[in-house]
Amino acid sequence: MNSKTFYPTLIFSFLILLGFCFGGCAATRKEIYIPLNPEVDRLPIYRKFSVQAALLISEEDKKYVYKGTPSGSLLTNLVHVFPLGDALENGSLQMFSQIFRNIQVVRTPAEAKKFKIVIAPQIEDFNFRYDEAGDYYLRMGDSRYIVPTAAVKVKITIYSEGTAVWEKGVKSPEEKKPVPYNPGFANAKEIGEVVCQALDYALKRMAEEIAQDPEVEKNAASLSIDGLAKTFAQHRVDYQPGLPGTGERL
């Protein structure tokens, strides 16, 4: 990077940090709610399993909200609130309705017993941050750009007659979207879109495998789901003020 681009970049980063530092000193840490509205891709699938499946997401997991600060060095005094549980349910419904005849959400293993196939999704890992944009964006007029970045890991377990017949976790690559930086932070929509893209990637990779898995196909006509006595609420990392990238269950 030559001096023509280095100094504007340095000044831009300093102004972001300085502005939010003064804001943080004058008041409590600011919380921002990030809307998540997943719209999943269509799968290249031309047939569905002719069975109704249950999507098992406990009430606790449905209400799971990740609350934490970004990793990295930008905007680290902003506490972000992500409704990840709701996004996981909505994204899973859209994705798995493409490979099963019908999908119905259930909250408990007892409800799941009525179904031949049970799909149990969980979010295992999530991280996000803001990066500085490259030289190309820094040269675009007077605008300054930041890059919302996010990745998510999702695990899917499929049960038939109380037995796990398929299980896998997939972590998305880091999804990114350069956007103009707005003082005071007006980029909630953009970071939400990046998170939804990461969630879509993970769900799509697993749905494609499930649709072609012979064991799932063989068990699609099995009788009922038994023995799911365990809770599917996963452990969360406690949010600690001042530590980037941590989250809490609200």
Please identify what each model-predicted range represents.
Residues I57-K63, Q122-E132, K171-K177:
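Generic short beta-strand segments
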Residues N102-E111, E217-S222:
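Surface-exposed patches in mature extracellular/periplasmic domains of secreted proteins
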Residues I11-C21:
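Bacterial N-terminal signal peptides
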Residues A26-I34, V106-V165, P244-R249:
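Surface-exposed short loop/turn segments
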Residues E89-V105, E161:
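A structural motif corresponding to the C-terminal end of an alpha-helix
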Residues P70-P83, V147, Y159-Q212:
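Short secondary-structure boundary motifs at beta->alpha junctions and helix caps
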Residues M1-F12:
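Bacterial N-terminal signal peptides that target proteins for export
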Residues G24-Q94, E208-L250:
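A structural "domain/chain start" motif
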